[in-house]
Structures are given as structure tokens and as C-alpha cells.
Amino acid sequence: MTKRIFLPFLVLFLLPSLVSAQVAITGKITGVVVDSSGASVANATVTVKSPALMSARTISTGGDGAYLFDLLPPGTYEVTITAPGFEAFAETGVVLTAGFTATVNGKLSVGAVTQTVHVEGEPVVDLQTAQTSTTFDQTLLQDIPSGRDPWSTVAQMPGVTSSTFDVAGDNSYQQSAMQVHGSTQAEQIYSYNGLDLNWPGANGGYTQFYTNHDSFDEFQVVADNAPAAVPIGGVYMNMVTKSGSNEWHGQGAVYYLTAGTQAGVKFPTYNGGPVTSGSPFDQTMDASASLGGPIMKDRWWIFGSYRRYDLRQEILSVTDQAGNPVVDVNHQTNTDLRSDFQVNPKNKFSFIWMYNEQNRFFRRDTAYAFVTADASWLQIEPAYILEGLWTSQVTNNLLLDFRVGYNQIRFPLGYQPGVTSTTLNVQDVANSTETGAAPYAFANPAWVLKWTAGGSWYKADWAGTHNFQFGLEWGKSFNGYNYNVNQGIDVLLNGGNAYQVLAYNTPTTQKNYFRDTSFFLQDAWNIKRRLTLNLGVRYDNFRTYYPVQSSNAGETFPDLFPITTYPASGNLVDWNNVSPRLGVAYDPTGSGKSVIRAAFGIYYIMQGTGLAETANPVGLFGKYYSWTDTNDDGIPQESEWLPQGAATNPVSEFGGSSTHINTNMSRPYSEEVGAGYQRQIWNDLSIGVTYYYRTKKNLIGIENSAVQKSDYVPVTGFTNPITNAPLTLYSFQPSDTTLYGKFNYTVTNIGLLDDNSYNGVEFTAVKRLSHKWQVLGGFTIQRQKGVYGRGFSDQATSDNFTDPNLDINRNDNYLNLDSTYVFKVDSTYELPWKIGTSVNFQHYTGYPLQPTETFEVPNGQTPSPVDVGESVILQPAGVQRLPSVNMLNLRLSREFAIYEKWRLIPTVDFFNVTNAQTVIGEVTTFGGSYLFPYSTINPFVARFGLRLAF
């Protein structure tokens, strides 16, 4: 494994001729140089310099006077233009963010070169790209009150909806599922310096790496109309880490709150009485320190950062047997190191190492109300990321960029330190208690290896100017699941009396892999200076599989679970897909202050090892056996629950795979259309309006191919309790009686699910920081409707499309995290005497509810029909909704200059200022607890901070 890890880093230095693809972590500066008559000035010398650059870069204009600088790191730039016989031209204050193209046109006047015309300006409208993205710069990252994690940061972006609502970081220890403008829920990429390094399991849209908020220079989110370099059409988080500079700079910060700075919990009511709900703070402490600077000025920069974050919350709805709420203790540490070395003016190397531990000390099984500390899991979760980056300016117009990254992951749920190998897990189903030890020990080892290489080539005088970008990306990912159970059994009691024994096939190990390869080509073709066509195409190959696997020879009960070897699966899917990415940007006035954009693209929905996991025959199996405690010692001997040895019949069992993959199915994708207008209306303020449309195709679900829908017959006599209307259900009555109990589940494309659409209009206002204030705001009106599939992330793998009972009220549902009106505002403003203020406000229409009920429907078996539980949708999602959510967070700060460049900034943050403890979760299963409120937003809390920067 060591050789596999470090070989790509060796290749990084030995193969500079490779070219390939990745997402922009840099920006561009482009423009046209003309004389006073408007004629192009060829061969003018254009130079850019910035504190973000180790050395200035210089190019010459083409025959049409055009020029382009690509692969510029985020920062503030000065652009200087000189030409013989003309006065020099210089524009300062040009701010670049990741993915932004700044247009700086130079108009030269006849005169001496020694004379310079200075212009101070900051382009805020990107005239050449069609993508929709939001960049959180240092001011937004540091000065907006938030949970200081990726999910509470993305939640500030216009149009985004999330599965959680953050109050001062109360959800920062557990990641959220996000979507934007109808994207697939949890279709999320966590990109570090342009390398996609997600956790590879399930649908591939999650992370195991919890970040250091203060280590980022920028946090860019690409959402819609993305170019061919971006693989998905969901939430693409492009996190750019800080680097050193030619001057030493650093920061130390601490943020603190306790239960004493928090308002009291207001319980929701149900049937006239209060409901215990909420997870208020006990205490949080978030401390970080960072330092960066030069080892050799203009040659070698270094940066380092450390964070320790402790979070303690009371889980009010879960108590011990004495009635005290349990305390959830969480601990996070991060260490981040970066080194940048400028080998020569045209070649730069960077090395990045990030380490994270995300620890939860008492993670409890949610199946029981009372779980003792010794029966909880200990989660000590280490992860690290290694990255190597190389940028080379081959010529003035050709740049190459190579990156390689490795992500090592291990997510464990282990036994507590005091639990020995002979300690048994004891569950009392009547008293809802769990004691002794956790039900099992679990580990999820995983790794991701990615390398990419990309090129940018600029060509003028081809019916306009062209910026070609091209690239190749290759990756291999592994995801495993390991289980072990003390003595191979759990003990089940019923009211303190012997009841059952649950025997497992442990220890067991499951292995899953996927490989992905991509290539893209993109051209930004600028025609007559005002029109830019973005023409892109992307190719993706995805393969997932599991290797040859065997049961563990050390199984506790090999007689119950025979040792078996399973052959390799081969490629369960081998998808080869081509997707167009087409966009247009037009400057209607030629002033550089407004742009009309339109785009169309196909985006293939991301995948992880989920398909391989679904079909993998190796996993956790269990069998329940009746237990008679004949010697009354409370300890199950084998003779008491296996009186006939392996011939003893279990009461029930689980595990084993009866699910298969249709290897010929097509990869799911979405089609996106966007059109909008953006205009700079004052200084650094721009406003815009954009229409978004999206539909998804080739979505997947499960069918039971062992039977047909025609094997079900309609039956009456049922009533819909929501509408009180008669309800027709369907009884399984096949003419072939051997089909009873037959299951052959197949994951395949479900054409019915193609009936879906998203329509939205979004109004935005963005002002970069200048004149002491800044704004990021958006108002979104949207609707996402279609056919509902049981499952998650638009994969209906918990459904059965052969069962007509599950089709009842399946159509015309509001889907996923649909919210009709979403309004967001982030803003900072500096009052006199260096008093800083900031606001973070978010409004969401409540998410849709979907009522269901399980009916017992007798089948046609003779002589005694068997009742089959059928979970039926009583009403399409969205007819009823959760309450709307309004969240207002404020900050006050005061900056003190204490020594030259040293600044001391005390802060106080006020979260959920209105103390709106809104219900955000209700039981949707009809019955005695229908619409029972089980989750609410946490109460108002104040957090105090102190930041020292230089």
C-alpha cells in the first residue's frame, strides 16, 4: 500500500509532460489593449503582480490586442500595460477569487513610457463565464456568525437548502445533506485545492474529513451551469487552503459558550402537553492558531494551522434510568501544513498535509431509550489528506497544472475502554434498555487516490480569442466494512427475563471498490470582445466492483454461518458517458458592467461504492434464537439456545444479499438550463436575476423480478385516515403458488421516476468589501415536483416498484428538501471607532411532509392467508409542510491596534436572536404519534470570541 501512495508523488516530479483536468482554484485576468482611437495595440507588454504571487508574470498582447493570464492564485492584483510610444497604464485593486475572470481593458495614450496612467477599479461582473458560484472570502469566513464548518457556510449561499439548521455549530459534529436548485440531495463534492476527495461509500456524496475553518483562504461553491471541469451538478465545494507570503502573518482565535449564555428550552406541545425535545449546549470551546511566511522571499513559503474544537450537548429526549439527559461529548482536532516553492519564475511546487480527528466519546444506539455509557460506542476517527501540486508556465500562452492527492480514512465505532472481550451486550426489549457493551464493534476503513493534470492554452486571432482548457483525471477508491461482536452474540431480555440470543457471523469483512476516469475539453471563445461562447464536453468512465471474498475463518459460529468463498463480481456497471456543457455570456452595453448569461448542460449523478455494497454477498448476518436460562445465571450457554446445535431453528434472521445489479442499466443524469442577467449598479455592488430548470433521467430503483405486478389483485374495505376516502389496496395472489416468499430484487432504471422537474427564479445582490461594508444576498422562488421514490439521494433503493401498493400517491410529490421561498442575507458593516457589525439571516418555507400508514393486507395463501405489512403514502408530500424557519444571527466586534500590524478583535455572536425554537421534524407515520414533534431548533445562545491577527 505504501508504494501505491507515494508513487504518484514521485510521478509528480518526473513527468512534467502530463496534461489533464481539474476544477479552478485560481482566477484569470483578461482584456484588450487599444489606443485612443480604439485600434488594437499588438505586442504590448502586460504584467501582473500581487502579494499572492511569488514573482510577477508578464505576457504580450496578440495581433488583436488581447491577452489572458490564467492560473492566478486568489488575491488582489495590479495590472500594468506598456508599449513603445505610449504612456504606461496601470490598474490596481483587481480582486481575483477562485474561478473568477476579471476583465481589465487598457486604453493607451500617446506619450512617454515613463508616464503612467493610474486607474483604481475592481471588476465585479464576470463577463466571460456562465457558471453560478458563490465565493466566501476571508471577510465572510471570519466575520459572519456561523457554525464554522462547511455545512453552515454553504447554508449561507442563495438557494441552498439543508437537512439541518445550525445554531452556533450545534450540528458541526454531524454532516448535513445539502441541495441547490433541484440538485440531487447529498450530491456534494468536497474538493481540497481542486482535488475531489470525498468519502467513497454509499452515493459518494459525503465526507469523513472535518475541516479547520481558519485554514481556508477561500471557500467557493459551484452550483449551476458549471463548466466541463466540474463533474456534478450539485453542491461543489472548492476549498482553497491558505499559503505563506513574503511577510510573516498569523492568527490566533478562541470562541467559547456555555449553558449560562443560552436561553431556556421551550418544549413543543403535542395533544396539549409538552414534548421533551432539543439538544442545548453544555459547553463549546473552539481554539485555533496559524502562522505563515517566507523561508526564502519570492522562493519558498510555508504555512501551518492547528485547531481544537470541543462540543458538549445535552440530548434531552434521551435519558439514563435516573431521568437525567445524556451528554454527547465531541472533540475535533486539525493540523494543516503547506509548503510552496518557486523553482524558477515559470514553475511552482506545493505540498499540503491535512490531519483530522473527529471523536465522539459516547455515541449511542438509537434503537433503545436508555443506553448506559458502557453500552455506547467510542468513535475515535482519524483521517488525513496528502496533496502535491505543480504549476508550469511553458510559454506565455500555455500553462500546465498537475495535482495528486490521497485521502486515508478510518471511521470506527468501538467498545468503551472498560469493556473486555467477554463482556456481552444486553438488550431489554420491554424496558428499552441497553447495557454491558455496545451491540457490535465496527470499522469503516477507506481510501481515495486521485491524480489530475490540466492545461490552459490561450490563442488569439482565430476569429476572436480562445482559452482552451483540457484535462484528464484518474481515481481509485476503496471502502470496507468490518464487524466484530464479543463472543459472537447479543443477549435479549424481556422485562428482565431471558428471551432470545442474537448470533452473528462475526468477525466479518466486506470490500468494495470503484474506479473513475474523466477527460474534458473547454473553450472560452471571445468574439468581438463582447460575446463569449463557453463550449465544453466531458467524458466519464465509472466502474464499481467487489473482489474475491471469503467468510472469516475465525468466525465464532462457523456451524451456523458456513465458511464460504464468493467470486469477484467483475464490473457491476461500466459506464461510459459524454456530456455537453454549453454556455454564452454577452456584454450588452460593452461597458463591462453587465452580462447576459445562458447555459445548458448534462451532469451525470455522482456515485460511490453504493451499488457494490448493495450487491455484495459478504456482510453482517444474524440469527435470533429462543433462549431458556435453565441454570438461571443470566448468561446464555450454547446448550440453552442451541439445544440441537446447528439444526436448531432460528426465530428469525437477517442479512444475506438477495439484491442484484442490472449490469446493463444506464447512469442517472440531470439536464440543466439556466439564463440570467447581472449588472454592476454602484461601485462594487451587482444585482442579478437567474432562471433555473432541471430534470433528472435514468433514475434507479428496485424491482422484485421474481414476480409481476399482475400477481397483485385489488382489495377494498380500507379507508385513508387523512382524507376519510375509501382506499383500494392490492393483495399478492399469484396464480403460481410457488411464488409466495420469492424475492429477487434487481437495481435498475425506473422509467416512472423520470417524471420530475425543478423550476426556480433567483434574485441576487453581491457587494465585495469596500467602503467598510459587504453584502451577499439572495431570494429564491422555486418548486421541485415529480414521482416519489423511497430511498435517498434520488436512488430509490428502499422501494419495490413491482408492488402496486407502493405506487399509491407516488405521483405529484414535492421532492426532497423543497422550500418554496428561500431568502438569505450575509452582510458586514464597520461603524465608527472600528466597531464591526455583521448579520446572517436565513428564511425557508417549511419542508414537505409525506404521511404514511402501514396496512395489514392478507395475501392469497391457502388455507390460511398471511397478513403482509404494506406502507402506503396517504397524501403526496407537500400538501402538508413543516413550519417555516427564520434564523437571525448577529455579531458585534471591536478592533484594537496594539502594535504596528497586530490587531486584537474581541467578538460576541448572538445566534437565533428571536429564540424561534421552530419544530423541524415530525413523525409522519399515521397512528398515535402522528405529527409528533421530535426535533426543534436550538434556543438563543451568545458566543464570545477573541481573535489576534498580524
Enumerate the language-model features and the residues they cover.
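C-terminal beta-signal and adjacent terminal beta-strands/loops
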Residues: 684, 697-698, 702, 783, ...
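Signature of Gram-negative outer-membrane beta-barrel scaffolds
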Residues: 322-326, 438, 465-591, 793-797, ...
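Periplasm-facing N-terminal accessory domains of Gram-negative outer-membrane beta-barrel systems
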Residues: 2-129, 137
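Periplasmic N-terminal accessory/gating domains of Gram-negative outer-membrane beta-barrel systems
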Residues: 62, 86-243, 260-262, 270-276, ...
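Transmembrane beta-barrel wall of Gram-negative outer-membrane proteins
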Residues: 249, 279-360, 378-404, 580
